[in-house]
Amino acid sequence: QATRAELWSWRKTPEGRLAEIIVLDQFSRNIYRDQPESFAYDGLALALSQEAISLQLDAQLNPEQRSFLYMPFMHSESKLIHEFALKLFQRLGNEINLSFEKKHKVIIDRFGRYPHRNAILGRVSTPEETEFLLEPNSSF
């Protein structure tokens, strides 16, 4: 239902909206691990997160909840989105989450995408990406 945007009634509360985002952003990554579908709902999760922030619903959530609300920004392959993500995680004040965002942003700034997704998504890796993927901690 979430993948078809049928859970709009959940969006009546900040917690309900967060639940829908978690289903789209987190559940899909685990249910469809190593399959293209694991990233298929990233755009919808990001749009819902952006809208929640625009409506200032994040202010009604506790810091742990906000970290999950902001996760779709970290999963994006957009440099522009990562600029905003960095600000979100800095404002959140959790050093662990901020550290992870910085690591994600470095990869996006360098490649414009996450090379570890290439094989799953049927994308051809560049020689630089292939070399990067041989390094420790090159994927999440």
Show the residue positions of the predicted features.
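Intrinsically disordered, low-complexity activation-like regions
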Residues: Q1-D34, F39-F140
